[in-house]
């Protein structure tokens, strides 16, 4: 049988197109919304801790407060834009009034505080909450992960602050209520709200 070059390549091209049209079996399965939330929480916490660590090394607690004021909202906004979720931080005793909790966040964090005050091992993962509710509007999905006070956090959130830090906090956050904490206590939470789906 004498086939032209284009006729011989047609079955090969057809086979390639067929392979491209198939779903990617054996690849990474798509993450669920709660798995994506956990990954985002890891990223938010990791990036913010890295920024705060650099600020503490370069300029101490006053520089760290400045980083929290400027960089934390920028990181959250970038993650919100890339994920489609509303990414942020909240606390019952907040430093920035823009981070004040809504009713659900407050209730979840009160539960976190009770959980953290029980005799859990120090190495346990921070408590988290996965909330999915259905209404006439559709399905609402929320994720919260506790931010637990660590010894390094005491410089900015402990009972005793350096005078220059106290001055900076009063200047930048006149309504601050985020001091007087001890290690192991609930400091706040990372919070994600995904778009309502039908």
Question: What is each of the regions a protein language model found here?
Answer:
Residues 2-14:
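Bacterial N-terminal signal peptides that target proteins for export
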Residues 2-5, 24-31:
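Basic/polar N-terminal segments that are highly enriched at the extreme N-terminus
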Residues 11-23:
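Bacterial N-terminal signal peptides
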Residues 27-149, 165-198:
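Extracytoplasmic c-type cytochrome modules immediately beyond a signal peptide or single-pass transmembrane anchor
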Residues 150-160:
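The canonical Cys-X-X-Cys-His
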